[in-house]
Amino acid sequence: MSKMMVFTGNANPDLARRVVRQLHIPLGDVSVGKFSDGEISVEINENVRGKDVFLIQPTCAPTNDNLMELVVMADAFRRSSATRITAVIPYFGYARQDRRPRSARVAISAKVVADMLTVVGVNRVLTVDLHADQIQGFFDIPVDNIYGSPVLVDDIEDQRFENLMIVSPDIGGVVRARAVAKSLGVDLAIIDKRRPKANQSEVMHIIGDVEGRTCVLVDDMVDTAGTLGHAAKALKEHGAAKVIAYCTHPVLSGRAIENIEKSVLDELVVTNTIPLSAAAQACGRIRQLDIAPVVAEAMRRISNEESISAMFR
């Protein structure tokens, strides 16, 4: 642990401070700012030669600024002779374009970001709940994708919900929701979204009996909260007594707060992989959990060459 040093950019300094408190080490001294024309400026204010450096920087909004901060920081530490550089990216932005749909002329931006990080000297990446697990394969360096579910499950248990049922908001999230349901020993329901015909509104079919149940929607992220709002409405229409959503990443873009306040969702519980905006903090239906202990433990294990997978057995 003596060679371990932790630094952060401007994306989520509060999370970085929480992580170093868990590790009982100081936060490293680096100046990350901008030149007058908007270019990213990085200067390391202490010796990092021979050190095991961890850079905590989610690539959340403003996505491009935060990504460039991470890239320029990594280059600065490589040129300053750090032995190993681990990019700790609690929320991995640019993850939604992870494949090229047939006949579509689009970029695979997740691969572009992976290449950028590798080129500037990042030796290892630590992420939380990647939007798509296959993104790990875009990297030519080791990637540890840890799960936020233990933090969510612990809170669900603490709430002592009556007649609890876990719900996947779509078919793609079934594996995640099933794992949470299995961990809690409760039933699982699935929302199957279908569009009967072109230009017709989406119809939500509920697979499972939610009548009188406390339904907990589980997803990796909440963006505009439109899907969660529609899911909560469908569940209430099918007799659910209460609907709470648990999501690891609070992206909360666009009209998300307005959508949450207008919805029948009783509560939205998120982690601090992304800092909440002032509007989100003021929303009485949003509650934030601390994921720093899980991130800190993963970082400790990486630094000590211990197993990461053992954390989730």
Curated annotation (Swiss-Prot):
Positions of Mg(2+) 1 binding: 131
GO terms classed as biological process: 5-phosphoribose 1-diphosphate biosynthetic process; purine nucleotide biosynthetic process; ribonucleoside monophosphate biosynthetic process
Co-factor requirement: Mg(2+)
Free-text comment on the cofactor: Binds 2 Mg(2+) ions per subunit.
GO cellular component: cytoplasm; ribose phosphate diphosphokinase complex
Keyword Cell cycle: no
InterPro entries: PRib_PP_synth_CS, Pribosyltran_N, PRibTrfase_dom, PRTase-like, Rib-P_diPkinase, Rib-P_diPkinase_bac
UniProt EC number: 2.7.6.1
Enzyme's top EC category: transferase
Pathway as given in its UniProt record: Metabolic intermediate biosynthesis; 5-phospho-alpha-D-ribose 1-diphosphate biosynthesis; 5-phospho-alpha-D-ribose 1-diphosphate from D-ribose 5-phosphate (route I): step 1/1
Entry keyword ATP-binding: yes
Coiled coil: none
Key words of the record: ATP-binding, Cytoplasm, Kinase, Magnesium, Metal-binding, Nucleotide biosynthesis, Nucleotide-binding, Transferase
PANTHER family recorded: RIBOSE-PHOSPHATE DIPHOSPHOKINASE FAMILY MEMBER (PTHR10210), RIBOSE-PHOSPHATE PYROPHOSPHOKINASE 1, CHLOROPLASTIC (PTHR10210:SF41)
Its biological purpose: Involved in the biosynthesis of the central metabolite phospho-alpha-D-ribosyl-1-pyrophosphate (PRPP) via the transfer of pyrophosphoryl group from ATP to 1-hydroxyl of ribose-5-phosphate (Rib-5-P).
Official protein name in the record: Ribose-phosphate pyrophosphokinase
Species whose genome carries this gene: Pseudomonas aeruginosa (strain ATCC 15692 / DSM 22644 / CIP 104116 / JCM 14847 / LMG 12228 / 1C / PRS 101 / PAO1)
